[in-house]
Design a protein with these regions (language model features):
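Hydrophobic membrane-insertion alpha-helices, especially the h-region
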Residues: 5-24
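Short, surface-exposed binding/anchoring microloops in extracellular/periplasmic proteins
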Residues: 20-69
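Envelope-exposed proteins and targeting segments
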Residues: 46, 101-103, 114
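A short, structured loop/turn motif at beta-sheet edges
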Residues: 57, 107-114
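Short, solvent-exposed, Trp/other aromatic-anchored flexible loops in extracytoplasmic proteins
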Residues: 78-110
Length: 136
């Protein structure tokens, strides 16, 4: 049996850890809320339309890659107005579908680097979840 005093200490410690975890996860989500990143396959032009927008206007440089194709698309460029749109022509649709063709983006954001990864989707589909990472 746990003594009442020890039970109280354990209860307070458990609640404190829970609060810290919840606050930290909300901070991370809020940190990335200002970014929009999408990759859409345009059937008519057989190309991929990639869009990025940073509503905080702190993005200055990008490294964009489309992996999983016969030849990896790689481009590095300066971003103006913290947004860009790229139309990337492709030779053919991947044999095993778009899930095997991730689009990655590395953004210089203020004093840090933000990494993003998404999947290409058809025009009539909902945008997949964007995975974020950060390096200070």
């Amino acid at each position: 049996m746990i003594a009442p005093r020890n039970f109280l200490v354990i209860l307070i410690a458990t609640i404190s850890v829970g609060v810290v975890i919840l606050l930290n996860s909300n901070y991370e989500n809020e940190y990335f809320d200002n970014f929009t990143f999408d990759a859409v396959y345009l059937k008519d032009s057989n190309s991929i339309l990639i869009t990025f927008d940073d509503t905080n206007q702190k993005s200055s440089f990008a490294i964009l890659e489309i992996l999983g194709m016969e030849k990896t698309f790689h481009e590095e460029f300066v971003i103006s107005d913290s947004k860009f749109t790229k139309l990337v022509p492709i030779d053919n649709i991947p044999k095993y579908g778009w899930k095997t063709t991730p689009v990655t983006l590395e953004i210089t954001y203020d004093e840090s680097v933000v990494y993003m990864k998404t999947e290409i989707h058809e025009e009539d589909q909902i945008s997949p979840t964007v995975i974020f990472g950060k390096n200070d």
